[in-house]
Regions:
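Positively charged n-region of N-terminal signal peptides that target proteins for export
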Residues: 1-4
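Bacterial N-terminal signal peptides
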Residues: 7-15
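Zymogen propeptides
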Residues: 19-113
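Short, solvent-exposed aromatic-acidic interface loops
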Residues: 52-56, 136-140, 190-194
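Structural motif
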Residues: 76-78, 120-121, 129-130, 152-153, ...
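Active-site-adjacent helix-turn-beta-strand microarchitecture at beta-sheet edges
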Residues: 90-164
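Conserved, well-ordered active-site substructure
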Residues: 92-108, 163-174, 179-212, 221-256
């Protein structure tokens, strides 16, 4: 019911109203495009990155991650793919999970969306999460408990990426993340119809009013959001970001992908 009452409100207004859930999600339409949005208070909730299991095998599916968390008495309140990867699902850029680095920071321009600089890093630290432009991240020496690099940046210090064209006909399903200046407010978005980079970035800057935002990926993008009765199936993913909460032993079966 809350979703109907909040329909059409900026998520920053709608979801900072004392809701008990670890993550709040809603579907909305902005400037003619449809999106699913999930917002997290990083100062209160547990965000994690997932790539490999204890044997070093890529997990790659929401259901596989759920199986791992079940042993901890935890479950996914939300999850989505989080950064670009090679065909073997290894990260293209910086990847750190719980203090262990698998891949170094990549600072040079290159091919594809990842190399469309400026790109950036999604950095998880105690009580906060930040999107930081790659060269600024390198210069700052920021130590992240977990981090994933992707690109391009969507919003840099309140400005759209300089290469984005308003009338571009390059339209795909896209997902990404934006963060507030204090690192508390984190909003994940996935489009429900194909959008160009300009439209997607404008969602974060103009509607969500977030000063930093980072693109995660395109047509492979998937979302696990029990709030929306949604858990997308598909090919194996690389890095995944999720919000973790205690498993309720009285609840029904978890959505499977």
């Amino acid at each position: 019911m809350w979703r109907a009452l909040l329909w059409g409100l900026p998520l920053g207004i709608a979801l900072w109203s004392g809701q008990a859930s670890a993550v709040e999600c809603q579907d909305l339409t902005y400037e003619g495009n449809r999106y699913a949005l999930c917002e997290v208070d990083a100062s209160r909730e547990e965000l994690r990155l997932f790539l490999r299991d204890d044997a070093g095998e890529v997990m790659g599916h929401f259901s596989t991650i759920e199986d791992r968390l079940e042993a901890e008495g935890k479950t996914l309140a939300f999850a989505t793919n989080a950064g670009m990867y090679h065909s073997d699902r290894s990260p293209v850029g910086l990847y750190v999970e719980d203090g262990s680095q698998e891949m170094r920071l990549v600072t040079n321009p290159g091919p594809g969306n990842f190399g469309l600089v400026p790109n950036g890093v999604f950095c998880l630290r105690e009580g906060r999460a930040d999107v930081i432009e790659t060269l600024a991240f390198e210069a700052s020496g920021t130590a992240c408990k977990s981090a994933t690099q992707s690109g391009p940046m969507l919003v840099i210090d309140g400005e759209l990426h300089p290469r984005f064209l308003k009338d571009s006909d390059s339209r795909y399903i896209r997902n990404g993340v934006g963060t507030s200046a204090d690192g508390r407010r984190v909003v994940f978005a996935i489009s429900r119809n194909t959008v160009n980079f300009h439209d997607f970035a404008s969602l974060f800057r103009d509607h969500l009013q977030l000063p930093q935002a980072l693109y995660f990926d395109g047509n492979i993008s998937r979302l696990h959001a029990p709030d929306l009765q949604r858990s997308d199936a598909g090919f194996m993913m690389g890095p995944v970001v999720g919000v973790i909460e205690d498993r309720d032993t009285n609840e029904g079966d978890t959505l499977q992908n």
